[in-house]
């Protein structure tokens, strides 16, 4: 389920978050702002959440982390909540737990320890290291294997994508990255590739307009972000070479919320011959 499909720019969509349900597990990959509220609005079982996997530590991928730790517990989560991520994850989760300490105690004081089991209030960090241009299996349980792999989001390091495997089925989540050879290798013959995308032609027009308007700061930001994301033609070519069965695009910059932008995307994605989905918040994809 593509819970959140947006970038940091304001809009109706939630920031990045993808839910994966597999063999009794409920995982979330990234938890940007708005993901918690969107998860509940979609009717997803937040109290059953047992794993969060972070791709990197930009705000639009992790800003709802304290919120989801707290909200899932307050609403009735009785299982442990495990957080997985590359280098620096432990300090991040410890900070979130510390931030919530007073709030958690207020809940116990009001509702009692029988209702609010304080032992489940804290999230449990699982930090791992992925070397450059390499991958590591960092989760194996109940027939599920999850592999983290290095992606290209420089100067943001670490940054990873994830390969989820179960009974011969494969789903790959790119995280934020420019075109990446290792990602292409990991995505080979996968059932679904969930990949970020940037409409570079639109960004260049936006950059030109900001320059003409004298918006130096915003112009610099729009210029800079183009060098660590993947363009439409690039992601289409990668998916075609990797023989991806279905391409689901998220972290859409800009959001394809009108027919003009949507058609610009589709016109530039013709290099992929398989099914393409410009994801909306709440879209569901089933791998059989």
Question: What is each residue range found by the language model?
Answer:
Residues 193, 287-288:
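Short, solvent-exposed mixed-charge patches
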Residues 1-172, 178, 261-287:
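Binuclear metal-dependent hydrolase catalytic cores
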Residues 161, 167-170, 178-280:
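Cap/insert and terminal regions of metallo-dependent hydrolase folds
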């Amino acid at each position: 389920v593509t819970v959140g499909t947006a970038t940091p720019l304001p809009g109706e969509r939630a920031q990045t978050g993808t839910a994966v349900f597999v063999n009794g597990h409920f995982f979330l990959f990234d938890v940007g702002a708005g993901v918690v509220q969107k998860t509940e609005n979609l009717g997803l079982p937040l109290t059953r959440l047992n794993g969060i996997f972070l791709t990197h530590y930009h705000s639009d991928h992790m800003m709802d982390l304290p919120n989801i730790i707290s909200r899932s517990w307050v609403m009735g989560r009785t299982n442990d909540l495990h957080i997985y991520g590359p280098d620096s994850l432990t300090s991040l989760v410890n900070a979130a737990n510390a931030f919530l300490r007073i709030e958690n105690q207020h809940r116990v004081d009001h509702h009692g320890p029988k209702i609010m089991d304080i032992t489940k209030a804290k999230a449990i960090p699982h930090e791992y290291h992925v070397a450059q241009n390499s991958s590591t299996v960092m989760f194996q349980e109940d027939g599920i294997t999850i592999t983290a792999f290095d992606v290209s989001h420089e100067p943001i390091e670490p940054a990873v994508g994830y390969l989820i495997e179960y009974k011969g089925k494969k789903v790959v989540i790119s995280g934020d990255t420019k075109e990446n050879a290792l990602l292409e290798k990991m995505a080979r013959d996968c059932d679904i590739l969930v990949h970020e995308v940037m409409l570079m032609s639109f960004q260049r027009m936006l950059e030109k307009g900001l320059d003409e308007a004298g918006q130096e700061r915003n112009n610099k930001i729009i210029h800079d972000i183009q060098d660590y994301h993947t363009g439409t033609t690039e992601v289409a070519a990668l998916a075609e070479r990797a023989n991806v069965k279905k391409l689901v695009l998220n972290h859409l910059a800009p959001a394809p919320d009108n027919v003009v932008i949507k058609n610009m995307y589709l016109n530039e994605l013709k290099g992929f011959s398989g099914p393409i989905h410009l994801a909306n918040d709440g879209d569901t994809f089933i791998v059989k």
